[in-house]
UniProtKB/Swiss-Prot annotation:
Matching PROSITE patterns: RIBOSOMAL_L35
Species of the source: Erwinia tasmaniensis (strain DSM 17950 / CFBP 7177 / CIP 109463 / NCPPB 4357 / Et1/99)
GO biological process, any: translation
GO function terms (MF aspect): structural constituent of ribosome
Key words, A-Z: Ribonucleoprotein, Ribosomal protein
Transmembrane segments: none
Keyword Chaperone: no
InterPro entries given in the database record: Ribosomal_bL35, Ribosomal_bL35-like, Ribosomal_bL35_CS, Ribosomal_bL35_sf
Family, as annotated: Belongs to the bacterial ribosomal protein bL35 family.
Source lineage: Bacteria, Pseudomonadati, Pseudomonadota, Gammaproteobacteria, Enterobacterales
The protein's name: Large ribosomal subunit protein bL35
NCBIfam families attached to this UniProt entry: rpmI_bact
Amino acid sequence: MPKIKTVRGAAKRFKKTASGGFKRKHANLRHILTKKSTKRKRHLRPKGMVSKGDLGLVIACLPYA
């Protein structure tokens, strides 16, 4: 049976944690930042976790993570 390919875009976006979850970066922090408040940008800065509902999709994209 052939190996399962990793989705390369997902491999660049998600990192697996020791407890089995996945870290991710928040959206809306790339451009057009002048109209966004400092508070909003500050809250988007730390890494988020992939929610339980999306976890299966991420695991399917990263079979060897």
